[in-house]
């Protein structure tokens, strides 16, 4: 199968997976206690009012028909109006997506840099490498919410080093672009560190394992035979071969990153997509739930397809839609 055909097949499978997940979520939302009519009219509305809302919003149609109509409107850019915020869902999600991407990209880049460095350093240690890798595995097992609470209490509330809530200080609005950017970066330190710590430990473990495999290869033995220092071999030759494989792993971590972002945003009152989802769940805001989850699922599937493509590029024997995770 050609590369283009494999790519088209992977995209088609990704679209089918997205539609299946959206259909399941739509059915769950429609069958939730209270229903959309109660969410729109209010819990204390009379039955007559709820019935009128049901007719006005065509909520009495079959669920399958409602889903097809929802997907058709979504494809045209009409994601509906939030029941709770009374604003277009697309604009609301776009507004909250920027802080979430800032949090995720900052955490992912920090985790890759720190995890790669720690993993390579552990691989270069003849006797202490296994201990370092075990410590990284232990850190990876720590709950994100618990780590966040420790950092908030210690570095935030007790020592006062960093702010513990929000995206920025309202007093910095008129301070200029540079000062505002620094203020956002300062507020992002604890949320980014909380989200990055677990992923850095994961990348360190993966890097250590892959680096140890690389160090058994012939080119490493040849370099040692030529008298090249172990540090140069690890940070020069081995690091170059491990790097592309980490890119595949990073793309496949996007789903876990979103899950952690929801917890971190809730903990630090970070005004992102995760906090919006929490509010939508509490307030039974069905349009926001469907739109936000749909976007997250689409991004996760896209990153998975991209990981398959990168994996196939690294190893041409693997087709993009059949690449291993």
Q: Where do the protein language model's features map onto the residues?
A:
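Membrane-embedded alpha-helical segments of multi-pass transporters/permeases
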Residues: 18, 22, 26-31, 145, ...
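Transmembrane helix irregularities
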Residues: 32, 139-142, 258
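Generic hydrophobic transmembrane alpha-helix motif, especially the helices
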Residues: 136-197
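Alpha-helical transmembrane segments of integral membrane proteins
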Residues: 2-5, 21, 93-129, 144, ...
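Hydrophobic alpha-helical segments of integral membrane proteins
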Residues: 3, 7, 11, 53, ...
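Hydrophobic secretory-pathway targeting helix
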Residues: 2-24
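An internal, D/E-rich "acidic patch" concept
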Residues: 60-116
